[in-house]
Amino acid sequence: MSSVLSDYTIGGVKIHFPCRAYPAQLAMMNSIVRGLNSSQHCLLESPTGSGKSLALLCSALAWQQSLSEKPVDEGLNKKPEAPPSCSCACHSKNFTYSDTNLDTSPHFNSPSKPSSGRNGVSTPCQDSPEKNTLAAKLSAKKQASIHRDEDDDFQVEKKRIRPLETTQQIRKRHCLEKDVHHVDARLASEKRVKPESPIGKSFSDRKDSFQNVDGLCSRCCCSAKQGNNQEPANTVKKDHGGQCKRPKIYFGTRTHKQIAQITRELRKTAYSGVPMTILSSRDHSCVHPEVVGNFNRKEKCMELLDGKHGKSCYFYHGVHKISNQQTLQHLQGMSRAWDIEELVSLGRKLKACPYYTARELIEDADIVFCPYNYLLDSQIRETMDIKLKGQVVILDEAHNIEDCARESASYSVTEVQLRFARDELDSLINGNIRKKSHEPLRDVCYNLINWLETNSKHLVERGYESSCKIWSGNEMLLNLYRMGITTATFPVLQRHLSAVLQKEEKVTPIHGKEEAIQIPIISASTQVVLKGLFMVLDYLFRENSRFADDYKVAIQQTYSWTNQIAIFDKTGVLAVPKNKKHSRQKIGVNALNFWCLNPAVAFSDINDKVRTIVLTSGTLSPLKSFSSELGVTFSIQLEANHVISNSQVWVGTVGSGPKGRNLCATFQHTETFEFQDEVGMLLLSVCQTVSQGILCFLPSYKLLEKLRERWIFTGLWHSLESVKTVIAEPQGGEKTDFDELLQVYYDAIKFKGEKDGALLIAVCRGKVSEGLDFSDDNARAVITVGIPFPNVKDLQVELKRQYNDHHSKSRGLLPGRQWYEIQAYRALNQALGRCIRHKNDWGALILVDDRFNNNPNRYISGLSKWVRQQIQHHSSFASALESLTEFSRRHQKVTNRSKKDEKCTKDNEPTLEVACLEDSTFTSVSESSHQSPENSTEEAEVCVQELQCPQVATKSPSVASHGVSRRKKSDPGLRGESLQTMKTEKNEISRSSSPTFGKQTEPVNWPIFNSLRRHFNSKVKNCTPVLKSSKNRAPGSSTFNKTALPLTGNCVPSNETADTSLGPCLQSEVIISPVKIEATPATNYSKQVFCCEKDLLPDTELSPGTEEAKCPSSNKAAETEVDDDSECFTPELFDPVDTNEENGELVETDRSSHSSDCFSAEELFETATGFGQK
C-alpha cells in the first residue's frame, strides 16, 4: 500500500485514499457517499482499470467509520423527567423496595423474568449519587459491553429531535429513559463501590431482590411498552456506547477469485485493519481430509457433524480458537485484510474449521465479502444467517445480476430426486420417528410424483430428444390446490419441515427431569429437495400470490444413456450381450422446473430491507434495464470515463475479411465455409501484425468447434500455430484443468521462443471473459467475432421475451427484443474489457461484423461509453490492418525500448559501486539505492555517475548530479525499516548481496542470471547511474543539506569498503572507473521523486517517526488534483510483476515511514538530467 495518503472530504465524510484519485474515482466516491447519506440506491459504471475497487472500499468504509465518530446522543446525558403519578399497585406509596435501593424496572411482568430494557438488568433508584456522572456512565457502558447479549438490535433508541407526542407517548418514553439510565448508573455505582465484584454476581443479587415484586398491572403505562420492542423502520440503531450503530457492509462479487482481488485492494488502503470475514462454500474452505476428497462435500460434512458413523469433525470443535475478531487479528498475518486461503491455512494449522469460523466472524465484522448469490438466494441467506435489514449491500461485477436474481428464485427437481425423498420419509415414518411431521411432507412428494407421471404423457416435442409442457404460475396454483397445498396449509407444512430438521427432542421420563435425546433426521439431499420446493412455494403464495404471474412451471423430458443393468440367466450366470451397443439403454428423465422470469422477485427481499444498494461494474451499459428489471429505483447513476488517453487504445469495426467477403456472424452465415475461412485468414493477419497475447471471442462453443475443425482441415490451424501458441477454451471440465491451460497461455507470452506470444480462442460468457485479468502483454488485442446474442431457441429465453412483451406497458419493462439485445451487449462489453487493465496499458479492440457498419445507431449504442467514444468504422480490411499495424508498431517500439533500458539496468547492476547490506536478503535490482557511507558520523552523498567500458575511448557527456544529506547510520530505527522494505519490494529480480565488496559471491544458478552473467562479459552499456559516497565531505557540506532523508542502517563500515571500485563485484571482469561529476545547485525538487505534492520545507527531515505525507484538503488543492491527471497513480492498476519504467514515464514513487529511502537508479538519472538541463 502506498503510504502517501490523499484525504478527500466528500459529503462530510473524510476519505483516506492511498494515492491521488482519478476523476473517475472521485466521481464514484461522491456518488457512493451521497447514496449512503441519503439511503438511496446507486447504479455506477466505471471502466475496468479506472480504480473502481479502491473507490468502492475507501468511500464505503470511510462513511461507515464516520458514523462512529458522531457525538453521543444528548438524550443519554439528560436527566429523565419524573413520570406522572400512577395509581397502579407497582407505583403506589406502600410499594417498598429492598434495602439495596434497587428500583424494579416496569418491564418485569414476572418476578423471575429479567428486564427487557437496556442490557436486561435492573436499575438503581433515582437518588443514586452516581447517576449524573458522565465518566461513571461511560465506564459502566464499557463494562456492560463485555456481558451484553445479542439482542441489542431490538433496543429502542432516543432521537435528538422528536415529533410532537401525545401524553401517553410521553409517559411511555420517560419510563423507558428511566430504565436506560438506571442500567448505566447501577453499573457505574457497582464499579466504584465494589470494583472486585463481577457483573454476573451483582446481576444475581439484583435478581434475588426481584423475587418479591408483584407483576405490573394493566393500567400502568409502563406495561404498555412491554411488547413494543421493535424499532421504527426509519430509526438508526445505537450501540451500547450511545453512538450510532454502524451498518454492516455486505460486499458481493461474482466469484471467489474476484473476492481475492478485492481483499488485495483492501490491503492497500488505510482501512486494511477493519474487522472482516469472507463467506465461501465448503469447496473453498473445508479442510477435513475425509471431506476434501469427497464429491458431495456438504453431505459428507453434515454426516461428520451428526456423527452418524461414530466419527465427528475435530476441526468443527476447534472453531472457538479463532471465532472472534480480536483473537483473529492478534494472530500472525491476520491483522490486515486477509484472503480465504490465509484463513484456510490458519485453520489447518490450528485445527479449526475455516468454513464455520468465517460464519462466526460475521457478528463482529464491519465488512463481509461473499459471492453475491449468497445475498440473493433466500436459502443461502438462511443457512449463513445473513441478516440484511438496515445494512449496506455493494454488488461488484453486477452486469450479470439480473440472471443471478432469476436463478436464485427458480428451482428444478427431477422425478428421481422426488422418489428418493419420498422413500426416505417413508422409512422414517415406518420407524415411528416424528410420524406426525413426516407424513404431511411425504404426501407432498407423493402428490408431485403422481402429477409428474400423469402429465409427462402429454408433453409436446421440442427439438431433438426433448419435449415439454408449460403452465403459468396461476395455473400451477390450481394444481397445487388439488394436491392440498394452499395458502392456508402451506404455513403448516413449513412448521413440519422445521420440526423434522431438529436434531434433538426434549422428553420427560416418568421419574426424572426433562432431557434431550438425539433424533434421526432426513439426509442432506432430501433437505435440499424440500427446502428448494418450499422456497418457490413461498414466493408463489406470498402476499396473496403477488408473484404467481412471474413464474412459469415446466415439465421437461430429456434422455440420457446408461449402462444396462446386469442380467443373469437361469443358472445364475451373468449373461453378456453379444453386441456391446445393446448394453446401453436410453432412459427418459423428467424434471419439474419452477422458472422465475422476473428478477425483482428475489430482489424484493433485499430492496425492502437494506439501507442502500450499490450496483457497479465496468460493463453495466445499457443502464436503463436495471431499474425496471430489478424493481429498484436507482436515484444515483453514473457512467464514468476511462483513465487512459485516446492514443492508448485502437477501437475499430471490420465488416469484411482479407478477401473482401462480408462478415456477418448470423447463424446462416456461420455455417458456410466461406465465412469460416475468411475469419481464419483475418485472425492470421492480426496475429502476424500484433505481437504478444491475443484474445479472440466467439458467440458460442458450437461455433468454436466448427471453426477449429474447419481450420485443421484446411491447414489454417497449423499456420496459426506457426506464428503463436494457439489455445482453445474448453467447455466444462475441471477448474484445475482450465487453470493449467491458462498457465500455458501466460508462459507462452512470458517465455516466448520461436513463436511470438499466444492466441487464446474463447467464448463470450465463458470462463475467460469473466473476471480474468489480461494486462499488458497478456492481451495486446481483443477480437470479437459477431454479436453474442443468447440462444434464441432456448426455452427460458423465449419465455422471458414473451414475459417482457406482455408486461412492458403495465410494469414498464423493456420489450422482449430490447431485453434480448441488451444481453448481447453486456456479454460483448465484458469480453472487450479483458484488454486495457490499467492506466499505462495499451491494446486494440477489433469488432468483426458488418452489422456495426451497416446500422451503427442500433448496434453501437449498446457498447460501453469509453468504447463508443473512440470507435472507428473501416470500409475494408486492408485499411483497418494498415491502421492497426501503425498503432501496434508505435506502441511496441516504446515498450521494447523501455524493456531494453530496464534490461540494461539489470545487466549493469552487479558492476555498480554499492554498499552491501549486512543482511543476506535478496534485494530488488531496479529499486535498491546504492550507498557507501564512510562512517557513522559522515553523511552519504548521492552522485549520478556515468558508466563506461574500459575499451571505450571517448566519454559520454557528463551529467549534473546533486547531493542529498542523509540520516546517520546509527539511527536505531533504520535497520528494521530497511529489512521491512526489502520484504515488501515489488518487481523483484533478486540478487545476492555480499557483506563486503572485497568478497566474490557464489554464482546463482537461476536461468535469468545465466543470461545476466553472459552479458557481464560483454560491453557494459552507459545507461545506469551509481551512488558514490564522498569520503572527504564534511558534515553539513552537502549541497542540499536542509532536507534530510532517512538512510538504511544495514551498511558496512568505511574500512571494509575502501577502494572497492577497483575490486571485483559479482564476478564481473569489467573494471569501471567512476567519473565524479560536480553537483549543480538546484532547489526545485521534483515532487515525483520525493513523493510530496508540495516542495519539502526547509529543515524538514523525513524519518521513521515522520507522519505519512498527505494531500492538502483545501478546495484549491482538490481542484488541482482533479485537473492534473498526469500525476495520478493507483496501485490497483498495476500488476505486481510490472515496472513503471516500461511505460517510458516517471510515476510517483511512494515513500513511507516504514519503507526504505532507496531511490531507483532510473529516477535519480532522470531527475539529475532534468536539473542539468535547467
From Swiss-Prot:
Its cofactor is [4Fe-4S] cluster. One of its GO terms (molecular function) is metal ion binding. Binds 1 [4Fe-4S] cluster. Residues 101-160, 187-208, 923-1001, 1102-1155 are annotated as: Disordered. It catalyses: Couples ATP hydrolysis with the unwinding of duplex DNA at the replication fork by translocating in the 5'-3' direction. This creates two antiparallel DNA single strands (ssDNA). The leading ssDNA polymer is the template for DNA polymerase III holoenzyme which synthesizes a continuous strand; ATP + H2O = ADP + phosphate + H(+). Residues 888-1063 are annotated as: Interaction with BRCA1. The modification N6-acetyllysine is found at K1174. A motif (DEAH box) lies at residues 393-396. Its main location: nucleus. GO terms for cellular component: BRCA1-B complex; cytoplasm; nuclear membrane; nucleoplasm; nucleus; replication fork. It is found in: Nucleus; Cytoplasm. Residues 1138-1147 have a biased composition (Acidic residues). Residues 11-445 form the Helicase ATP-binding domain. It comes from the Eukaryota. GO terms for biological process: chiasma assembly; DNA repair; double-strand break repair involved in meiotic recombination; homologous chromosome pairing at meiosis; homologous recombination; male gonad development; meiotic DNA double-strand break processing involved in reciprocal meiotic recombination; protein-DNA covalent cross-linking repair. Residues 101-126, 923-935, 990-1001 have a biased composition (Polar residues). ATP binds at A185, R186, L187, A188, S189, E190, K191, R192. SUPFAM superfamilies: P-loop containing nucleoside triphosphate hydrolases (SSF52540). Binds directly to the BRCT domains of BRCA1. Interacts with the CIA complex components CIAO1, CIAO2B and MMS19. Belongs to the DEAD box helicase family. DEAH subfamily. NCBIfam families: rad3. DNA-dependent helicase and 5' to 3' DNA helicase required for the maintenance of chromosomal stability. Acts late in the Fanconi anemia pathway, after FANCD2 ubiquitination. Involved in the repair of DNA double-strand breaks by homologous recombination in a manner that depends on its association with BRCA1. This is Fanconi anemia group J protein homolog. It comes from Mus musculus. The gene is Brip1.
